[in-house]
From Swiss-Prot:
It catalyses: Na(+)(in) + 2 H(+)(out) = Na(+)(out) + 2 H(+)(in). It is a multi-pass membrane protein. It comes from the Bacteria. Belongs to the NhaA Na(+)/H(+) (TC 2.A.33) antiporter family. GO terms for cellular component: plasma membrane. The keyword Transferase does not apply. It comes from Pseudoalteromonas atlantica (strain T6c / ATCC BAA-1087). Na(+)/H(+) antiporter that extrudes sodium in exchange for external protons. This is Na(+)/H(+) antiporter NhaA 2. Keywords: Antiport, Cell inner membrane, Cell membrane, Ion transport, Membrane, Sodium, Sodium transport, Transmembrane, Transmembrane helix, Transport. The chain crosses the membrane at residues 13-33, 59-79, 94-114, 125-145, 154-174, 178-198, 209-229, 260-280, 292-312, 332-352, 363-383.
Length: 401
């Protein structure tokens, strides 16, 4: 378990660096003479047709509906593994990160609603600041917290997992469109087929993948957001059953997908969604209630919810601090949870899908501002604590020598 988490954290850290690079390139293109090229690239129409069945979308929506389904599939695999035998398999292990994640969803949403309560359209984006970008958060932690307790990293990962579950529930309940009964029936039939594959110990991964693609397409056509199909499909992948090559199926898929998601899927998503054009925009244009609600929700709401509820939970004896950690270190992690970036941008694209460029620009500005401030202050705080931990470790090593 420890070695797996170490590899996971390394992947997430390197992926976080790529996310920064991809987002920076998008910002440069969106604010340069290459803006038309950047925007035109995202609007390229792409269609897939099988007989009378057709899916036609601009490239941007293929990224958001297709590639992000792979990301949520990986999240589902991680959650299933942790629930069945990992960090989320017992009440004592999940109490603190679970209540922290719930508070980290509720408090930012309340702050956003407070800023936008008088605008019935804008208030639909209440869930945008509720998300945490696990790749960015773990990346910053790994860079600036090398000598901090491993338990603190596990706490951050667990909070992020619960946060992802919350985001999935929110998308399912609040950001799905008018439903198509026929498509839902096809999707349900696909899930039944996957259950039977699992029940009869079918070892061929290709069978699961083929049915999974059909389910994704059916869910996409049904009006339920297609990324939810990715998360649901993961729960039909056997945990211990070995595939045709002799590898346990779920861990094998998880291992294979991690580099693709971290180094391809999420950087492409960041490139496609982070380009905020500031041409002709004034400070007052950017600091509107949507932008402020998101930025303040991410920076203030996340840390207030997570740290505040953790303090109450620990002081009342319902849980304890991660082993070897301090309140200052936990506060630093709470700040990192305010890095919403990819997940916040994704929810923003759903919340204001029909509202046009102005709303999306406000969303992107708020997400980037709140995430940047949270990342910088969290990194500074953890770096100072990390330096003290390093000095302590060096003194102990010298004493032992």
């Amino acid at each position: 378990m420890q070695s797996y988490l170490g590899k996971l954290i390394q992947h997430e850290a390197a992926g976080g660096v790529l996310l920064v690079i991809a987002a920076a390139i998008a910002m440069v293109l969106a604010n340069s003479p290459a803006y038309d090229f950047y925007n035109g690239l995202l609007e390229i129409p792409v269609s897939i047709r099988f007989g009378a069945f057709e899916i036609a979308k601009p490239l941007l929506l293929w990224v958001n509906d297709g590639l992000m389904a792979i990301f949520f599939f990986l999240v589902g695999l991680e959650v299933k593994r942790e629930v069945l035998g990992g960090q989320l398999s017992s009440v004592s292990q999940i109490t603190l990160p679970a209540v922290a994640a719930i508070a980290g969803i509720v408090f930012p949403a309340l702050i956003y609603v407070w800023f936008n309560i008088d605008d019935p359209v804008a208030v639909n984006g209440w869930a945008i600041p509720s998300a945490t970008d696990i790749a960015f958060a773990v990346g910053v932690f790994t860079i600036f917290g090398k000598f901090l307790p491993l338990s603190l990293k596990l706490f951050l990962l667990s909070v992020a997992i619960f946060d992802d579950i919350g985001a999935i529930v929110i998308i399912a309940l609040f950001y799905s469109q008018d439903l198509s009964t026929t498509s839902l029936i096809v999707a349900c039939a696909g899930f039944v087929a996957l259950f039977l594959l699992n029940r009869f110990n079918v070892r061929r991964q290709a069978a699961y993948v083929l049915i999974g693609v059909v389910v994704w397409a059916a869910v996409l056509k049904s009006g339920v957001h297609a990324t939810l199909a990715g998360f649901a499909l993961a729960w039909f992948i056997p945990l211990k059953l070995k595939n045709e090559d002799g590898h346990p199926m779920l861990p094998h898929l998880e291992h294979k997908l991690h580099p693709w998601v971290g180094f391809v899927v999420l950087p492409i998503f960041a490139f496609a969604n982070a380009g905020v054009s500031l041409f002709g925009a004034s400070i007052s244009d950017l600091l509107n209630p949507i932008t402020l609600g998101i930025a303040v929700g991410l920076f203030v709401g996340k840390q207030l919810g997570i740290f505040g509820v953790c303090w109450i939970t620990v002081k009342t004896g319902l849980a304890k601090l991660p082993d070897g950690s301090t309140w200052v270190q936990l506060y630093g992690v709470s700040l990192l949870c305010g890095i919403g970036f990819t997940m916040s941008l994704f929810i923003g694209s759903l919340a204001f899908e029909e509202q046009g460029l102005a709303y999306q620009t406000s969303v992107k500005a708020g997400v980037l501002l709140g995430s940047l401030v949270s990342a910088v202050l969290g990194a500074v705080l953890l770096a100072r604590s990390n330096a003290k931990s390093k000095e302590r470790a060096e003194r102990e090593a010298a004493r032992d020598a």
